[in-house]
Every structure is written in C-alpha cells, then in structure tokens.
UniProtKB/Swiss-Prot annotation:
Gene3D superfamilies: Aminomethyltransferase beta-barrel domains, Aminomethyltransferase fragment, Probable tRNA modification gtpase trme, domain 1
SUPFAM superfamilies, A to Z: Aminomethyltransferase beta-barrel domain, Folate-binding domain
Keywords noted in UniProt: Aminotransferase, Transferase
Gene name of this polypeptide: gcvT
Protein name in the entry: Aminomethyltransferase
Record's function text: The glycine cleavage system catalyzes the degradation of glycine.
Amino acid sequence: MTELLKTPIHPLYAKYGAKTIDFGGWDLPVQFAGIKAEHEAVRTDAGLFDVSHMGEILVKGPDSTSYLQYLLSNDIEKIKIGKAQYNIMCYENGGTVDDLVVYKKSETEYILVVNAANTEKDFEWMVQNVRGDVTVTNVSAEYGQLALQGPSAEKILSKLTDVDLSSISFFGFIEDVEVAGVKTIISRSGYTGEDGFEIYMASADAGKVFEAILAEGVAPIGLGARDTLRLEAVLALYGQELSKDITPLEAGLNFAVKLKKEADFIGKEALIKQKEAGLTRKLVGIELIERGIPRHDYPVFLNDKEVGIVTSGTQSPTFGTNIGLALIDTAYAELGQELEVGIRNKKVKAKIVQTPFYKRAK
C-alpha cells in the first residue's frame, strides 16, 4: 500500500481533534468538531482550512502570457499584475483536464494553483504543450496554503498583519505580507461562497501561521464542511462537476470560457462546435421533495426514462434541505421540472431549482 501524502500541517491535526481520511492520496482531516458545526462557523463567523495539498505550478519566461493563452480557456491578457483569474484547462475534445486559478506576479511570471489529485497530470500536460520561451516548474512542495473563510475573516487576519486587508479586492493578492511574523502571499479568494483569504507561505512556516490564526479563536475546518460549503455556493469540484468527459460549457462555466478571444486555445474548436450545435446536457440544481439525499453518480429519471446523473449532493447544513447538482438532458432541464432520483432501489421525487443555493449578502 502506498503511504499517504501529508501536508506540513499534518503533525498538528491530532492536537485539534482531526479525523482524517484518504483524499486523493493525501491523509487529510474530514472533520474536527463536526461537519455541521464547522459549516456554520464559516457561514456565520470564520473557519480555517489546511489546503496545503493543492498544487502550485510556476510558469516563467518572456512567452508566459501567450503560452497560457494557448493552454487555458479564459483571457489571460486581461489579468493585471497582482490579480488572479479562474480558468479551465481543456483537452482537444473540450473535456476538462482541470479547473484552476492563475496568479499574475509579473508580465513574465505566473503561479497556477491546481487541484491536488491532478497536480502531476496537469504538470505533465503543461510540459507536453509548452510553446515559446517558458519554463514550467512544479513548486507544490515549497508551499503551504491555508484558507481563512467567513464574514469575520478580514477582522481576524487584520490582527496578525499590518497590511490593510480591505485594500485587497476579490481575486486580488499581495506578496511579501507578514502574518504572525511569517512572509506570505495573501489572496482574497476561496471555495466556500464567503468572503475570505487564501494564504501562501513556505512549507516550513505553515504550522506557525495555522496555530497563530487558530489562537484568535477560529475553528479548524475539515474537508466535509469544505464540500457542503462549496456545494451550497455551486462551485464545481473536479471529478464530479468537471472531468475529461464533462466540458466547462456543460458545467455552466461559460464565464471562464472565452470563445471569442483571439488566441486559439486547446479545446476551443470543440467547444465552439458544442455551443453552436446546442448543449445536449447541462448542470442544474435539484432539491428533493421526498426524503433522501442525492449522491454522486445516482441516476435521474423522468417517468421511467433516465435523463441524467447526480454529480454532487448533500443535506444542506444552512437550509436543512436535501440538495444536489445534476447533469440533465437539456430537454428536461427547465426550472421547476419535477424528476426522480434513483436512491438505492427506489425513485425519490425531486425538482429543478434556482442556483446557487446559497449566496452571501454583500
């Protein structure tokens, strides 16, 4: 059996009562105090996630921008220095290699933050598709990453740094910021639907920053609540809402797919064809009318015809409703449409509802 990978925070997990699981080859906390309590902490106050398992890939060189324009779906030329941008990396057929965030450090230097389980695959794909004068380096082992999320995030982090955090706009970042005496990069971003920050530092310093933030009375949060939070906010999870077989258009991520940008990007032609032909399936939100929780890969029916598949589902800790996301044949994907979800041996009534399920008050 392969030994599970561990983040630099791993030695501290037991101290805070973590229950760990194998997540994509990493030994990570699924919960600390409990998923519902952790979810509520992030929605109402703040919570701290260890996300050091995420991958970081450095792209440097005079042709970095044109290379990333070729590799990624969004318009890289629109990113200003000190800003980040959500992106999709596609295969030629329009399927998804990964979804990721691009940080622009300078005109010739970018950091791509990718999903942990995809880091090696992404890195190989990027190297395989190098164009022009660029170097691509997997620097994941050098970084620790924490996410402080929730309405109180700014107030709490402000106690540990001299930087005016209110000056950082959404998807903006500042480098060389001291947090608890440690040099960090702070980005106003996250994966919860709340305000918050993602904080990058040298791996060796991650534990110090983690404990300094928790000492301010913040709850540590595990993967269980990370999943319920992102699902309520309808943020895609690779392997569920996106995969090599699911295009970003089917997943409803059109805002990150710039089919009109001048540069050709890998998958552009296939995505243009898909859009022109009309999508045959699309991602929708569902809510169960009868008892039961929709789960990944459960079939969806209309009468006795299978018309789709659940990609993610849970009981919403915020609303108490049983919600999910499903890829549904476009003909049956209208708001209010009643469907049935196959849960074990029975069909449970559901309806298509407006998404996101949760949107924070500005």
